[in-house]
Every structure is written in C-alpha cells, then in structure tokens.
A protein has these predicted regions:
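Sec-dependent N-terminal signal peptides
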Residues: 4-13
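Glycine/tyrosine- and acidic-biased, solvent-exposed loop/turn segments at the edges of beta-strands
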Residues: 16-226
Length: 226
C-alpha cells in the first residue's frame, strides 16, 4: 500500500513539474528572441554601416542610432517593403515590424519590448485600412498606368483630423505643360468607404526656375467639399 501511495505522489510531482516547464516556455515566448550582435557589427562596419545578404537572399543594413542600433532588411519577395528592428544600446530588441519603403509608413503588426526584452504591446497598423488595404491601392495605380517605382511617385496614408483613414497617392502623368512643368496626378482615397474623394493635378519645375510662376493646381473633382 505504501508503494502505491509513493508511486502516486511521484506521478503528481512529475505532473506539476511538467506544468511548471510549460508555464516557463509560455512566458519565455513573450521575450524578444533577437539580439543585436554588437561585436560582429563593430568588426565589420564601414562608414558606420554593416551591409550583407542574409540566408534568404535579403539585403541587410545595420547601423548605429541615437539610442542604440538598427537593422533594416529589404525583403526581396515583397514590393518596396523593409523589415525594421530597433535595438537598445545593450543589443536587446526594442521594436520590430514592417514599413512600406515607398511612403515610409508602418504596415502590419509591430511588437514593442522593454529593456529586458519583454513584450509590452503590439499594434496592428493595417487595421484602420483593412477595408481598403495597400494591395487595392497598388492595383488601382496599375490600372491608371502609374509607375509604382517612378521618381516622383508617392504613396502615403494617415488618419486625418476627422478620424478617417486616408490614402494619398501621386505620380508623374508624363505630360508637360506649355511652361514645361511636370504634371502630377494626385488622388485621395477614403479607406473606410474605399472611395476616391478627390483628384487634382499639380505642377512643378523639374529644375528651379525663378523667372516663371508655376501653374495653379487643377481640380478634377472634389467630394470633400459640400
């Protein structure tokens, strides 16, 4: 009888130990797994940068920042997208997430960590724009024959002063005015409704011309004014 009781006690202790291990693993998962290799960076940097290609063929640039270090990964399989990592001066990960390089805005979910590498919060920057995501904007621009990687192409998004998620896009129309100005097509999209609310043409000199005035913008339509 004593042997049976001892056996059950051992099983119970083993079970508790297993649960403790699972809890430890679960808690460990909220810690940042990535660290900045300061020693490798200092040994390989040139002009303050260390540039290399990772195992997936992505170009990686590591730099020093005002408060630590940065790692920027140009994702070859995603259009104009970089994955950014910012690290504390200790090399512990501070924040990570993607940016759309064509507009400099954050996309997808970003994770933020404290100085111990513990996850403190996550923010989904795509959520306000989920009804009209970046993919739809790019598809629309293609339908308008816009150069997605053109010198003057701009794609930007923000929440406006009324709390409406808005897209702002522009590109070179490849039409010169009689004054020889470049013509830009400008579009504003309400991401909640998926509706173009404004289109206008603006103009500028490719090179500064102090002698002639730039033509005034031409409004094609504007639904923002009632």
């Amino acid at each position: 009888m004593k042997k049976i009781i001892l056996f059950h006690l051992l099983c119970l202790l083993s079970s508790c130990s297993g649960q403790d291990k699972k809890t430890e693993v679960k808690n460990e998962q909220i810690k940042a797994e990535k660290r900045f290799d300061i020693k490798r960076f200092n040994e390989n940097k040139k002009n303050g940068k260390y540039i290399y290609t990772d195992s997936l063929g992505n170009q990686v640039t590591e730099i020093t920042t005002k408060r630590g270090y940065g790692r920027y990964v140009s994702l070859k399989n995603e259009f104009n997208v970089k994955f950014l990592y910012h690290f504390y001066s200790t090399g512990i990960l501070k924040e990570e997430g993607k940016v759309f390089d064509g507009g400099g805005f954050r996309i997808g979910t970003w994770n933020f960590y404290d100085e111990k590498g513990i996850l403190t919060k996550s923010i989904d920057y795509d959520k306000p724009f989920e009804k009209h995501p970046l993919e739809k904007v790019l598809a629309y621009m293609k339908s308008r024959k816009a150069e997605l990687l053109g010198m003057y192409t701009r794609i930007y998004r923000k929440i406006d002063e009324k709390g409406v998620p808005m897209w702002y896009i522009s590109w070179d129309a490849h039409q010169r005015t009689k004054e020889d100005c470049i013509t830009m097509v400008n579009i504003e999209i309400d991401a909640q409704k998926g509706e173009i609310v404004k289109e206008y043409h603006s103009f500028f000199w490719e090179y500064n011309n102090p002698y002639d005035k730039v033509p005034a913008p031409v409004i094609i339509f504007d639904k923002t004014k009632k």
